[in-house]
A protein has these predicted regions:
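N-terminal secretory targeting modules
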Residues: 1-57, 73, 228-233
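Extracellular/periplasmic catalytic domains that process cell-envelope and extracellular macromolecules
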Residues: 50-53, 74-75, 103, 141, ...
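Catalytic nucleophile-elbow at a beta strand-turn-alpha helix junction centered on a G-D-S/GDSL motif
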Residues: 54-70, 88
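Conserved beta-strand scaffold positions in the cores of enzyme catalytic domains, especially
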Residues: 59, 80-82, 184
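Oxyanion-hole/transition-state-stabilizing segment in secreted/luminal serine hydrolases
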Residues: 65-79, 92-128, 148, 152-156
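Charged helix-capping and loop-helix junction motifs
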Residues: 125-134, 164-169
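A short helix->loop->beta-strand "cap" motif at the edges of active sites that frequently abuts
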Residues: 142-146
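Catalytic His-Asp segment of secreted/periplasmic serine-dependent ester chemistry enzymes
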Residues: 156-233
Length: 233
């Protein structure tokens, strides 16, 4: 009994330490625009070997884009450049925009980011303003490139933040209303059940999507993108 109690205490301590390290890592990422430099260099090294053809569709954003293993195959025949990295905030996307979006001269950019921003305590207005900067910069450099804004992702792990994320969605909707080349897609709605709560489409952490979750995203986005870009059909 004593050994069992001692082991339990050790396990609890280890879990507490791991959670503390995770929170510290997230805070460091939020405060350092170049936090994901190593991942960006991986993209650039791959580009140095074979640079993507212009006119494709770039998916950029945080780990939900990075872990989207079925993206390229699931979106065929749409040509996809996948540029998700780490637990990125919009600040990280803006910091690396000249390296992971603009050089490819894409036909369209699909962006999913923002949930980590809200999770770290940033306000919906702050996140919305950063999205506006993103749109302005892409539009200034690539005026004919479409920008697709994926809605915030509801999740079990951050359900307490959902009302704030919905406020971010309102900022994104407004951006789409103001710009003819900007579109808002409510992909987050595909992850909710009939009761309006997160469905069983997440891995063990309750935050990242499982295969079913990504399939729902593909089933939502692919027809919309093909309708907009019939040349890829």
């Amino acid at each position: 009994m004593k050994w069992g109690a001692g082991l339990l205490c050790v396990l609890i301590l280890l879990v507490a330490v791991m959670i503390g390290l995770l929170i510290r890592s997230q805070n460091q990422a939020a405060d350092q625009p170049d936090y994901f430099e190593e991942e960006i260099l991986v993209f650039e090294n791959a580009d140095s070997v074979s640079f993507p053809e212009p006119g494709q569709i770039v998916f950029v954003g945080s780990s939900s884009v990075r872990f989207w293993d079925s993206l390229t195959e699931g979106m065929r025949p749409l040509p996809i450049i996948q540029r998700g990295f780490g637990g990125a905030h919009m600040e990280h996307v803006l910091h690396n925009l000249d390296r992971v979006v603009l050089p490819y001269a894409p036909r369209a950019v699909v962006v999913f980011v923002g949930v980590n921003d809200i999770g770290s305590g940033k306000t919906p207005t702050h996140v919305g303003n950063n999205f506006r900067i993103f749109v302005d910069r892409v539009s200034a450099s690539l005026p004919q490139t479409d920008i697709w804004l994926m809605s915030m992702k509801p999740s079990k792990a951050r359900w307490d933040k959902w009302s704030l994320m919905r406020e971010v969605n309102e900022h994104l909707i407004q951006l789409a209303r103001e710009n003819e080349h900007v579109f808002f897609e409510d992909t987050g709605a595909t992850l909710l059940n009939s009761q309006g709560t997160p469905d069983d489409v997440y891995i063990f952490d309750g935050l990242h999507l499982n295969e079913e979750g990504y399939t729902r995203w593909i089933n939502h986005l692919k027809p919309v993108l093909l309708a907009r870009y019939p040349e890829f059909s």
